[in-house]
Amino acid sequence: MEPEILSIELIKPSSPTPRHLKTHKLCFLDQYRNHAYFPMVFFYSVTHDTNLNLSNETDIAQIVSVRLQLLKQSLPETLSLFYPFAGKIKDNLSIDCSDEGIYFTEARFKSPLKEFFNQQNFSCLTYKFVPFDAKELEGSISGLHVAKIQVTSFACGGIVICACLSHLFADGATLCSFLKCWVATACKNNEQRISPNNDASWLFPQNEAYPKEGTWLAMCPRFFGHGRFVTRRFVFDAKAIATIKAKASSSTRVQNPTPTRVEAVSALFSKCVMAAFKAKHGSHKTTLLTHSVNLRNKAKSILSEYSMGNIVWNANALCTNEEAELDLEGLVCKLREAMMKINGDFVKSLLGDEGFLNLCQAIKDENGVCSKAKERINFSSWCNFGLYDIDFGWGKPMWVSVIGLDGKLPYFSSTIILLDTRFGDGIEAWVYLLEEDMNTLELDKELLALATLDPCPLW
């Protein structure tokens, strides 16, 4: 199954961006990031239109056409608020907001959506919905689009929307804010329209003295492998998460004995992936557990929920050789201790005249921790983002995903992305590992007793 590309166009904001906003300066938190598109993928069924004959191809084509037009017609007004999304990357420090337009692709599969889910390892095939390829991660970034969207229709009338954003510009929370604004615009719900906040550019002003060795890629290149990275999706229901929580809070060792579902699942994967690393090396190697922390939640009096940019920082927990046999409770302790350090005081330390110096110290500290580790596991949680509320008027998505990367990228790092399940009480874990490590992880009895590997999201 391969999609047919029907059209590619640039959709411009409904009103021109003011002259003084034509250049969007990245903040120094953005300077830590490298360019890479990260996608959010939304799968929608056709079944909410009960007044149409779904056995009639003409009616199905009409449904798709109406929905597609709604998406396209509501984008310009959304882009007038989120104007950098219609821009291009100028260099490592700025976005050219000359309103060239957001990159918008229409594609089509001639088969019904259920056939996509009937394929073996269908989660690994979600890359077919993205409007970019691996070549855009190489070479010059100048002139690349900040954001891209692809809408793919199926013969049954189902639609898949993939929205991608450059990590050089902003994080997942920013993309989620854009999507919520797009939904409110499409549904003519002005009360729910989000106005983004550009406070990060002056709270954390960019600095040309930012160390070149202080970017995500440059700091620890040995953690970015050039082998074959593969993707697997592990799904935990509410019962499984309750079991993990119970195992991770079986004594009074933890001050707050009940871990969150994100802490519990992160601890489980830390244990299981480190066991896979041990099987490869023959012994435990010091491993760095890195969890992205949303700074907006840590300093609500300073930052808006809708602040644009990479308003995140890494919480790092080092598991040394002496800590090779930590149980789930011990791993929850380590992760929580690391994440608690990324707090309101940390955000305040980045403000004012000393802010950049304190950032440089934080980079130096992370570099020091990285130098002690032989392996690294990166965690990013998109739970509680409200992604299943992205409803353009024809119903909530039946599935929200990221993408599979089996052999598709020139380099990558061991990464686990956590998402809500459709009903909000479970977690989907998208795991990206070198194939050798994944082969071991897929045999982990403790993990398989708790998670289901790549279940179909249709039921």
UniProtKB/Swiss-Prot annotation:
Looking at the keywords, is rRNA-binding present?
no
Give, as one word, the top-level EC class. Answer: transferase
What is the originating organism of this protein?
Citrus sinensis (Sweet orange)
List its EC numbers: 2.1.1.-
Reactions performed catalytically? (1S)-1-acetoxy-luvungin A + acetyl-CoA = (1S)-1,7-diacetoxy-luvungin A + CoA
Function (record text) = Acetyltransferase involved in the biosynthesis of limonoids triterpene natural products such as limonin, a compound with insecticidal activity responsible for the bitter taste in citrus. Catalyzes the formation of (1S)-1,7-diacetoxy-luvungin A from (1S)-1-acetoxy-luvungin A.
**Family listed:** Belongs to the plant acyltransferase family.
Q: Name one GO molecular function term.
A: acyltransferase activity
Instruction: Report the Pfam families cross-referenced here.
Output: Transferase (PF02458)
> Is tRNA-binding set as a keyword in this record?
no
Tissue spec? Expressed in maturing fruits and in juice vesicles.
InterPro entries xref list: CAT-like_dom_sf
User: What protein name does the entry list?
Assistant: Limonoid 7-O-acetyltransferse
| Catalytic site positions | H167 (proton acceptor), D391 (proton acceptor)
Please give the superkingdom of this protein's source.
Eukaryota
Keywords of this entry: Acyltransferase, Transferase
Query: What do we know about how this protein assembles, alone or with others?
Result: Monomer.
Kindly tell me the pathway this chain contributes to. Answer: Secondary metabolite biosynthesis; terpenoid biosynthesis
